[in-house]
């Protein structure tokens, strides 16, 4: 009986997620959260050895490629056209203020000169540290750098792949060693936070690999991820570094913003976004086509209109928008992406002040659009007015409006405040196909 009790107790301890104990965000961390919310728009970059196969970042798992075969990519990944300056400028010209870069994805390949593994970019024919170049350029151009870091691993044998849901076909036979894997992650995170200057945040992904099913809404996993130790390590090395975990659940103590994948907060079309919305800063990420990593056959490109409206809808729900690109294996961001980003950038040049530095959830999102607010004005974003009424009705509106004008042109707009809400009259106004913005002062 005693042996059974000890076994059950051990199982409970291993499967329980422990948050960072007694976590109180530092003053610098709280300030970083506010600045993060102000930025509103960032670039996600999925890129690495998997890009060579041009079938997306999950190709190792999806095609059941064994480690002894997949490791040959290190001989051919040679991104000779990679230009960190161009990548950062592309993001900046699109109106983005931060970049989240894949330092290590689920295939375990490190895009930096880690001392913890030989499976890294500096052992390819390219032989250079991509993260170092990107970090230096971000710091030079005033763009914040976040590091995506995979919790799961399809390549290493010390990762507890026996209980994981993915990576079953990669040919691993050796018994896993969880303590070794946790030590490996801590060592790599220490490298990221000590060798590359200011890191604005760490973006974790892969917790869900150790859950029984995708509908599991608890933090109980088959392994102990040691989040208490990992989060404490990060906040000790860089106190203002923000932590997010794409576990599709409510954040736990130690996490500084809540991530949503391919869905706006409160909307769950993909099955990833069922978590309740926390009081922390929010971020939603989305792709420019279907794939995250480079996929040569994926031509399902989203339009400029779709992406601008996604950005506006995110801001109206008080969330940042992290828009992904998957560069080619040679290091070039494909023209379809750069052309679209340039067009988004032109829109941002005119309208960024209605997005950047604002907050949302002033009133719930409406069928016709959303509202954002800064310290002096509210911005009514009319994205999709379907009815023929000559007015726009904003329910639950309590602020006192002095004037209303079209944001572009400052033409006065008629309005009337009633107990039930605000009426804005649209007679004589030609609605823009993407976003008609009315500024309320």
Predicted regions and their residues:
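Mature catalytic domains of secreted/periplasmic carbohydrate-active enzymes
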Residues: 20-441
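Bacterial Sec-dependent N-terminal signal peptides
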Residues: 1-21
